[in-house]
Amino acid sequence: VGGTCGNVLSILAYLGWEAFPIARMNSDPASQRVKADMQRWGVRLDFAACTPATHTPIIIQEIRRGRDGLPVHRFSWSCRRCGHWLPGFKPVVAKSVEWILPKLDGASVFFMDRLSRAALNMSAASADGGALVVFEPSVRSDGRLLTEALRIAHVVKYAEQRFPELAGVMAKGAATLLEIQTLGATGLRFRHKLGARPSTWQHLPAIAVPALADTCGAGDWCTAGFLAMAAKRGVEGFQMAGVEALGVALRYGQTLASWSCGFEGARGGMYAVERSVFNAQIKSLSSGRRRAQSFEHRPRPRIPTAAVPCPACPL
């Protein structure tokens, strides 16, 4: 169970936050699997069944070894059995989430990775209520929606691999307080606008891992870790924290990202080790002790699960 938004929310719940996805899941097997997994980690599903309901998106991830022996992942969007396209993302409808808007008041964070009219309406309502609005684009968006998003979002984070740059982030009229560009194996760079004008870019190198199993989802761990440290008191607390505190929070996010690369799957580590082991390993990474023996663990028993059927496949 993954996807940028789903991963970030699940990881935040794992770290002790109350996380609420706003979605339109139906009762198909994929949706039931997603709901069960989210509930396992403490994610709240109060807003997960908005109408009209639809099939839950399904993506297939493969992990292979490159010529250099390192793991690489790729995704496919078609069923290997029937050949049909698997269900894709469908945003919630603006009309159907109007009842949620008043409930967003007092939220610490509103996170969005795909733009739609409903997402922008909810992000604006959240910002009015004091939330830190975080925008992490996963695909290219309609220009008008993007312009509107940048007038609302306080934190904009994106991968250099997808967006060499994102025009307008620090432009006049943008709400951006922090821009983060991840650089893969070389770390990330960031600039802020906590003062009168945008700062220069600052680089934070990546944290090395003792063993590399899969990089998928590392950026989501970075986001969740950063928010867990920097966004507890919404946008007001974020602004008051100062540049040094933001750097510490980003470094914590990078530590979680590094740790996650030691496991297959975007959130594989959550299933593989107990929380006490996670805490010890993060402490070890944070202190600079990256010896492989520091990461020895007894994996949790894995319960075999059947593949989720494609909705288009004949029964």
Where does each model-flagged region fall?
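Gly/Ala-rich phosphate-binding loop of Rossmann-like dinucleotide-binding domains
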Residues: A13-Y14, A231
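Catalytic beta/alpha-barrel core
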Residues: F110-S116, E136-S138, A159
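Conserved post-catalytic alpha-helical subdomain immediately downstream of the catalytic base
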Residues: I207-R289, P301-I303, L315
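Short beta-strand/loop segments at the ligand-binding rim of alpha/beta enzyme cores
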Residues: S126-E136
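Conserved phosphate-donor
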Residues: I152-P164, V169-A211
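Conserved N-terminal subdomain of the carbohydrate kinase-like
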Residues: Y14-S108, R275-L315
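A conserved, positively charged/aromatic
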Residues: T147-R151
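Short catalytic helix/loop segments, enriched in acidic residues and glycine
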Residues: V1-S10
